[in-house]
Regions:
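A non-catalytic, amphipathic alpha-helix used as a structural packing/dimerization or gating element
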Residues: 43, 145-152, 255-259
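N-terminal Rossmann-like or analogous alpha/beta NTP/dinucleotide-binding catalytic cores
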Residues: 18-90, 94-112
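Residue-level signal for inorganic ion chemistry
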Residues: 48, 86, 146, 192, ...
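Phosphate/ribose-recognition catalytic cores of enzymes acting on nucleotide-derived substrates
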Residues: 4, 162-259
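Histidine-anchored nucleotide/phosphate-binding helix
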Residues: 1-14
Length: 259
């Protein structure tokens, strides 16, 4: 953004979609589970909008992009945009085999009159800030540490969809939230704070497969305290406050209710 102001230019951020690890898990080894996303693309878009980024460009990660050489990536993608500066992460790699690096970009930039910069490694408490580290903090219920690494509280927002309606049979209705990639970087039962339109609501959430009812696919469901309205198809934002316990399998729904 500083360079955009300096050159009186617009800002654009590039992403690949899906994540490379998700792509390779489907085409190479379907048994290899990719790491869960910390921030889905819709969430990224909203954060960029809040940061007043002008444009977001999502590059489809497919066989064509995967096999594209670094030189072709530059000529077919970067050269198609009227760039005046280009900033990448400290460990940025691109092109087939991850052969493209910052040095190649800087050589290209010098020829084109484009400023190419790489960000310095960001550390906290002497350790590099990375997605792996953030996932570990979230999984270990260290939400304060995760917030420091993210620069914001960890939240997830999604559309409320129909489930099996089993919660209503024990007078504990839940809002089932659609998961775009089946998993979140957390699992278990959590105390949560939710934002639904203009309402701020407290509740309890379960992120897991629901073993008591024979579930297999991961599901995020939230029970909102003192709230029982039809909110299907609406979007809800969930802030995870504290982990209460791991997910457990109970003999029946009545035993689950007593918990």
């Amino acid at each position: 953004k500083n360079n955009a102001q300096k050159y009186n230019a617009k800002t654009i951020v590039f992403f690949t979609e899906p994540h490379a690890a998700e792509y390779f898990s489907k085409v190479r080894d379907k048994n290899q589970i990719p790491p869960p996303r910390i921030c889905p693309w819709r969430e990224k878009f909203q954060l960029l909008k809040k940061s007043k980024i002008d444009f977001a460009c999502f590059l489809k990660f497919n066989s064509k992009l995967r096999t594209m050489s670094p030189d072709d990536f530059i000529s077919q993608i970067l050269d198609s945009i009227n760039l005046v500066s280009f900033t990448v992460g400290d460990d940025f790699r691109f092109g087939a085999g991850r052969k493209g690096d910052t040095d190649l970009l800087k050589n290209w930039g010098e020829k084109k009159g484009i400023l190419v910069e790489n960000t310095e490694t960001i550390t906290l408490d002497g350790q590099r800030v990375s997605s792996t580290r953030i996932r570990e903090e979230l999984l270990n219920n260290n939400f304060n540490n995760a917030e420091k690494l993210l620069g914001r509280p960890y939240t997830f927002s999604g559309k409320i969809v129909h489930g099996q309606h089993l919660g209503r049979t024990i007078n504990i209705p839940t809002a089932n939230i659609w998961l775009p990639n089946q998993r979140l970087p957390i699992k278990g039962v959590y105390a949560v704070k939710c934002k639904l339109n203009d309402l701020s609501l407290n509740g309890i959430a379960n992120m897991g497969v629901r073993p008591t009812v024979g579930g297999e696919k991961p599901v995020l469901e939230v029970h909102l305290f003192e709230f029982n309205e039809n909110i299907y198809s609406q979007r809800i934002r969930v802030k995870f406050v504290e982990k209460i316990r791991d997910e457990k399998k109970f003999d029946n729904l009545d035993m689950l209710k007593s918990q």
